[in-house]
């Protein structure tokens, strides 16, 4: 892959939105929630026990925060082959992912997915494009937004890309309904926080059966597969990051947005398992907005899983940090 010179994509003033001609309604099933939680190793009771989820203020069994990324991937991968020119099977490299959360998905949700192609850049031997998918519940409420950055070799978009007013409207309609931790005893007061404060680290030991199971889960029924950076799919790493932050903040809905750029390394070959150490650090606090920015680093066998990763967290959701209290 070469950096090359970017050929700018001309943005035309089209009469219609450049929303992809694709919409799908997905039913969030409890068995899928439990399976997803099992594969990423998230044992929070809200993902397995409806009563525990209701006790935390959810309407039913709560999906892990990045469960929605599976819906995003499936929506993107079903529409992209209809928009790309080129011979042979479509192969994509997933390099970046962001997820903005209004609320967590719960069992019984019927979610509509609308896919928007936001940008495309042509290089000498590949095309880079950003795809944003809007998740809307049956009441018409925008509950989550996800943006993926993908690289494609040998395929180009058939159409030019235009800014979509509908996408900007959807962004404006996303209002995080944040949940404070059920147990407030661990909360950290705003005046005790500052840039540089570290969260306790956590060690995750991935199982190859879970990596393989995750691949099957997210690719089941798709017309083609995507090449993920490293041995573990990017979205699995995304799930591990959310698992780590959820364990640190004590509530699965504490984080309102996740951002990650995936590296090209995770676990070694099929005969070995390498521990992954996650660490978090407060990098900024917006007092007026009541939000903190957290940088996340994950290292396996001396190599990083992310080029960079971060999250936004309401300060009321951040617990007191004790460097001597790692979680496994």
Predicted features and spans:
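Short, proline-centered helix/strand-breaking motifs
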Residues: 104, 250-254, 265
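Residues that form or immediately flank small-molecule/cofactor binding pockets and catalytic motifs
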Residues: 153, 204-206, 265, 287
